[in-house]
């Protein structure tokens, strides 16, 4: 239960130092006082605690984020606004962003996940885009533990409950399991929107005398100081603090979304800027809008719609009540905008104005309760240049894992049941993937695909994180995660356009954790430049620790690609017997960090291979060219579990088996060498396909009998499709005590 905030005098704040509990250091308090020219009062110190948090100021991560490559010929708007925007031709643009809601979901899984969905949707429609798809990336602890099972059930319910109710399809995602996430689950949500590229909106408040209009849910005491809550380590006591978690209302969000899209689409002459009230609530949205326009601003807090009595200025400004937006509207157009919101039965009020100068002023009950420079809460927030230190695990010599396989069919069956590999349909079937009727490829293939209405084109989209790689090679995890997402899009027939990211790491004040963050970013940068697909949006979620124990470093990549012709959409499933099976790319004995290593040892050890970006580019360009020439009937990237796992997955939907003959040791069928694809080609297209002279080797053919017959250099074995599929489909429901 939330404890009502008790205001303190500036003198009491200076001596009792309550700001320490809000995430500010003594040095930061002194610096803020210097910037504003007086001892901060209760409201002002609250605003600083929110705006100077890592969640809002990126004070530890900004030096890393500034190195990202964020522009190319397609990018219309990059990081810094609610979401990034990319030109997709024909007057249209795609808008997308991912956000994390990790800490709230650990405390209150249903509402934490639901409000994470709501927040990222608002980011998209604040740009003027209609949200058309949701994706997620989830990470949980040991699935055998009841607490993990509870988190899985409630987080999935929260995502589905909000997305289904608002009418946006959840079309893709991933779910991973590892003990490092037992106390700190990861909930990363991504939203994609489509818009006319000449209607892009920004979050700015410019023009002296222009009005600030608040619209949406009334402000309450939920989620107060949530930005600071998300910018610190967890303890067991804090894990029980549900007052820091917001409560969402998807039906209110639907009204708010439709009303805002009407404003951005049909009342552009009235609108100066628009922004979601997300982390740090009203203070963040308002002061950021003023900062971007180099303006001053005054707000009357008595005019803020409130659902609870006697709220203090601290509470009003730092509440993170959901489903709220702030608009800057040109003088003389206020009633036009208010009338639109009235049509949707939304609470809306003029709560302030843009003023001359650069001060940020708040009035409450006729009293000036905040008078600080806008820059003191935005541009002048501290930036810390940390020095990283290589973790001991990376500096120490480590032996390569060399698996021994005596019963390949049993190993294959067990691999299909590994929590990270196993079928997740029992989870994603709780999401509506087809609302809006644009979804062409449903969850379960390499990437989701939605059509772009009014055209012959489509968008492919996917998410992925790579925690295990980061344990073994810090820079490689960002690289591998990026490349894996690109392969997913290419296998669907799409050219990657750009990415959004969520960088989920531990405490950045610890040199080893900061090293992991910085090195992962370097890997992402290298891949974005090599493939001309920049970072256009994202967020950082640090302090993912409980009682000093951190999660695995986990960069999450969300990627969107363009399919020029609907007829070239490709899925992973076998299509017909007698199609030829080709393996693209070389296979090596890469078992360190693999699912096979986890199965046989329960550990993740060893060093990872180096990445060959040029070879990866060659493979992806070859596959995309073959797909665009209509030579490929099915395509699947090889990742978790390697060749044999991918082969089985391709057979399940059509109930088709395969015969393959590979010049590899049996164990290498489970190797996780990167940069590989499995392709199927109809016999009549064999000559045309091989005439492309790509890095592809014919290894077998699809067969009608539901058996996988495999010949390696040292063994011949046969596995029943039914046996593999049963293991694949029943593993997760069994753990969750569900019926398959």
UniProtKB/Swiss-Prot annotation:
Residues that coordinate or bind Mg(2+) 2: 123, 276
Catalytic residues of the enzyme: 55, 101 (proton acceptor)
Protein's recorded name: Phosphoribosylformylglycinamidine synthase subunit PurL
CDD domains from the UniProt entry: PurL_repeat1, PurL_repeat2
Oligomeric and partner information: Monomer. Part of the FGAM synthase complex composed of 1 PurL, 1 PurQ and 2 PurS subunits.
Purpose: Part of the phosphoribosylformylglycinamidine synthase complex involved in the purines biosynthetic pathway. Catalyzes the ATP-dependent conversion of formylglycinamide ribonucleotide (FGAR) and glutamine to yield formylglycinamidine ribonucleotide (FGAM) and glutamate. The FGAM synthase complex is composed of three subunits. PurQ produces an ammonia molecule by converting glutamine to glutamate. PurL transfers the ammonia molecule to FGAR to form FGAM in an ATP-dependent manner.
Lineage, uppermost ranks: Bacteria, Bacillati, Bacillota, Bacilli, Lactobacillales
GO cellular component, one term: cytoplasm
Primary localization: cytoplasm
SUPFAM superfamilies for the chain: FGAM synthase PurL, linker domain, PurM C-terminal domain-like, PurM N-terminal domain-like
Organism of this sequence: Lacticaseibacillus casei
Reactions catalysed according to its record: N(2)-formyl-N(1)-(5-phospho-beta-D-ribosyl)glycinamide + L-glutamine + ATP + H2O = 2-formamido-N(1)-(5-O-phospho-beta-D-ribosyl)acetamidine + L-glutamate + ADP + phosphate + H(+)
